[in-house]
Amino acid sequence: MPTVNQLIRKPRIAPVKRNKVPAMQQNPQKRGVCTRVYTTTPKKPNSALRKVAKIRLTNGFEVIGYIPGEGHNLQEHSVVMIRGGRVKDLPGVRYHIIRGVLDTQGVKNRKQRRSKYGAKRPK
């Protein structure tokens, strides 16, 4: 345990808190326009073609967002809403696109966890 003199000479420093979703600027969601929609491969040991989009946000940030669910209708110039939340096996993907909002359609034939994928209740 340090002495009072040691603490006066070299005070304790609080650890720096890094923001995991800086482009959100403390907002729960942000709107943006897709500049590129493409697929990418995950880190080892996983293997797939994950659907992602590069998005220019209203605050000027350019981020990569993951498109969840099976199938999507996004293309260049689609207006999307994003939320925070990274994809563990895709480096650099820190945001999720919200399905069923703005130009993004919900997932077709979704029976369970519908609210997460913007799917309406089946009749």
UniProtKB/Swiss-Prot annotation:
Alphabetized PROSITE patterns for the sequence: RIBOSOMAL_S12
Gene3D superfamilies on file: Nucleic acid-binding proteins (2.40.50.140)
GO molecular function terms listed in the Swiss-Prot or TrEMBL record: rRNA binding; structural constituent of ribosome; tRNA binding
GO BP: translation
UniProt modified residues of type 3-methylthioaspartic acid: 89
A Pfam family per the record: Ribosom_S12_S23
One Gene Ontology term, aspect cellular component: small ribosomal subunit
Keywords of this entry: Methylation, Ribonucleoprotein, Ribosomal protein, RNA-binding, rRNA-binding, tRNA-binding
Described function: With S4 and S5 plays an important role in translational accuracy. Interacts with and stabilizes bases of the 16S rRNA that are involved in tRNA selection in the A site and with the mRNA backbone. Located at the interface of the 30S and 50S subunits, it traverses the body of the 30S subunit contacting proteins on the other side and probably holding the rRNA structure together. The combined cluster of proteins S8, S12 and S17 appears to hold together the shoulder and platform of the 30S subunit.
Family: Belongs to the universal ribosomal protein uS12 family.
Subunit-structure text: Part of the 30S ribosomal subunit. Contacts proteins S8 and S17. May interact with IF1 in the 30S initiation complex.
Protein name per its UniProtKB record: Small ribosomal subunit protein uS12
Species annotation: Mesorhizobium japonicum (strain LMG 29417 / CECT 9101 / MAFF 303099) (Mesorhizobium loti (strain MAFF 303099))
Top-level taxonomy: Bacteria, Pseudomonadati, Pseudomonadota, Alphaproteobacteria, Hyphomicrobiales
Gene: rpsL
